[in-house]
Curated annotation (Swiss-Prot):
Keywords: Disulfide bond, Glycoprotein, Hydrolase, Lipid degradation, Lipid metabolism, Signal. Glycans are attached at residues 329, 366. One of its GO terms (biological process) is lipid catabolic process. GO terms for molecular function: triacylglycerol lipase activity. It comes from the Eukaryota. This is Lipase 5. The keyword Repressor does not apply. PANTHER family: CARBOXYLESTERASE (PTHR11559). The keyword Lipid metabolism applies. Disulfide bonds join 75-112, 283-292. Residues 1-15 form the signal peptide. It catalyses: a triacylglycerol + H2O = a diacylglycerol + a fatty acid + H(+). Pfam families: COesterase.
Length: 549
């Protein structure tokens, strides 16, 4: 009798989990003991052939009886080896190419639009758990849901007594997902990668109840390009986040990234990149250049894509491929939309790492003199006026004690200009654009954070993307914020229900008195004021459009 009972329990534990989709299809997942995972579920038709570059089409096939126990392929990646320039040290390139990030995204394919659902063990339909939908980062050029599995977050949610379901959506990257130019705009195919994400959200709205999730309690969150994507979805259709009459999400978390400082989809630089692709693929003489690009093999298009600048090329964050205003879904420049209140009104968390710019400044190591620095700024920001450059240089002087990594004095200055360039890039794209968003956003409760957890780390400081390592693998004060507080926010719309060691204050305008910023250090959590580098803020955001790319 005891043996039979034991065998029955073992069989129960080992039984593959199931879920029933909205159309009645029943699918099987993976019992990973600490969680149950449904991996690589297609949510869109393969975006190949005539569907390349176009809006995603909802998946039409039957999934009934199929098993989803392994991640689907990553979307096509812009090869970093093709985007680096000679001034980046080869040792750095080798380290990046051998890193977990770039190894994890292989294999890849154009047929990549899948979604992953991970839930606590034993979760059934009707559990109505909050849902956290993850959008990965990677400069809109690289990345995959496979890089950072959500096991730690899901397990922590159970231990906290606030169980959540974690969903991760794949989306097209680089030229495959963010091609720009007049032809793309005329066809209505702009920002395909964002539309992939949006369709993934709609899939969640339709199907997550069958996994035990509550479609009315979805929090979207992401890091870097994923964080900027979250902001794009706040601005989508002028702030309309409804689907079938109900909100697609009720809250957003942004880790390193807010408004994308980008020109329109038919602007100068996006068109230049499009023309470069067309020319390098032999499509210049075609009567329909987009049709010609669609007729290329995957490898031919990828090779041409790899010949365009990437996020670690000389001008770095002047990205070749990124979300752009299109007059349709992103109806205007993102800074203006935020100023005008054209956003979904939901509670938000937004924050940064103290030294966001180092990773992107690394490719400017040959910028060593004052003249070099000015040339770099003018090449990076083609709309900047002489007055803009003068103000920027004054706000970010060549004094290495004022550069990034911040608060390190004369240390970490690999070149006389590197810490200066790091500071400009980090503040424009991440740290101070966060403040701009907070100063203008009135759509709901807002919380902000700044991490200085690695301030003693030589050269790097508290570098961009270190948070996702704490979030997925490590313990410490960073993990408390990126897991416990985020889980509490997704569950209760208040990070303080996580029982933090200090109360996380709501964010206010930087001009107001009082602490309004959660700060993360190696020793723990504390609060502070979001009022640093005001000269830099004024130089960068007197007219943000002067620094669009």
């Amino acid at each position: 009798m005891k043996l039979a009972l034991a065998l029955s329990l073992i069989a129960s534990v080992a039984a593959a989990p199931t879920a029933t989709l909205a159309n009645g299809d029943t699918i099987t997942g993976l019992n990973a003991i600490i969680n149950e995972a449904f991996l690589g579920i297609p949510f869109a038709e393969p975006p190949v052939g005539n569907l390349r570059f176009k809006d995603p089409v909802p998946y039409r096939g039957s999934l009934n009886g199929q098993s989803f126990t392994a991640y689907g392929p990553s979307c096509m990646q812009q090869n970093p080896e093709g985007t680096y320039e000679e001034n980046l040290p080869k040792v750095a390139l080798d380290l990046v190419m051998q890193s977990k990030v770039f190894q994890a995204v292989l294999p890849n394919s154009e047929d990549c639009l899948t979604i992953n659902v991970v839930r606590p063990p034993g979760t059934k339909a009707g559990a109505n758990l909050p849902v956290m939908l993850w959008i990965f980062g990677g400069g809109f050029e690289i990345g995959s849901p496979t890089i950072f599995p959500p096991a730690q977050m899901v397990s922590k949610s159970v231990l906290m007594g606030k169980p959540i379901i974690h969903v991760a959506v794949n989306y097209r990257l680089a030229s495959f997902g963010f091609l720009a130019g007049p032809d793309i705009k005329a066809e209505g195919s702009s920002n395909a990668g964002l539309k992939d994400q949006r369709l993934g959200m709609q899939w969640v709205a339709d199907n997550i109840a069958g996994f035990g999730g509550d479609p009315s309690k979805v929090t979207i969150f992401g890091e870097s390009a994923g964080s900027m994507s979250v902001l794009c979805h706040l601005l989508w259709n002028g702030g309309d986040n409804t689907y079938k009459g109900k909100p697609l999400f009720r809250a957003g978390i942004m880790q390193s990234g807010a408004m994308v400082p980008s020109d329109p989809v038919d602007g100068t630089y996006g068109t230049q990149i499009y023309d470069t692709l067309v020319a390098s693929t032999g499509c210049s003489s075609a009567s329909n250049k987009l049709a010609c690009l669609r007729g290329l093999s995957t490898q031919a298009l990828l090779d041409a894509t790899n010949d365009t600048p990437g996020f670690l090329s000389y001008t770095s964050l002047r990205l070749s491929y990124l979300p752009r205003p299109d007059g349709a879904n992103i109806t205007d420049d993102m800074y203006k939309l935020v100023r005008d209140g054209k956003y979904a009104s939901v509670p938000v968390i937004i924050g940064d790492q103290n030294d966001e710019g180092f990773l992107f400044g690394l490719s400017s190591l040959n910028t060593t003199t004052e003249a070099d620095a000015e040339a770099y700024l003018r090449k990076s920001f083609i709309h900047a006026t002489d007055a803009d450059i003068t103000a920027l240089k004054a706000a970010y002087p060549s004094d290495v004690t004022q550069g990034s990594p911040f608060d390190t004095g004369i240390l970490n200055a690999l070149t006389p200009q590197l810490k200066r360039i790091n500071a400009v890039l980090g503040d424009l794209t991440f740290t101070l654009s966060r403040r701009y968003f907070l100063n203008h956003y009135t759509g709901g409760p807002k919380y902000s954070f700044l991490s200085k957890q690695l301030s003693g780390l030589p050269i790097l400081g508290t570098f961009h993307a270190n948070d996702i390592v704490w979030q997925h693998f490590l313990l410490g004060s960073g993990s408390v914020i990126y897991n416990n507080a985020f889980i509490a926010f997704a569950t209760d719309l208040d990070p303080n229900t996580a029982g933090l060691s200090v109360q996380w204050p709501k964010s206010t305008s930087s001009s107001q008195a009082g602490d309004n910023l959660m700060q993360i250090s190696a020793l723990g959590l504390y609060t502070g004021k979001d009022n640093f580098r005001t000269a830099g803020y004024n130089a960068l955001f007197a007219d943000p459009s002067h620094f669009f790319v």
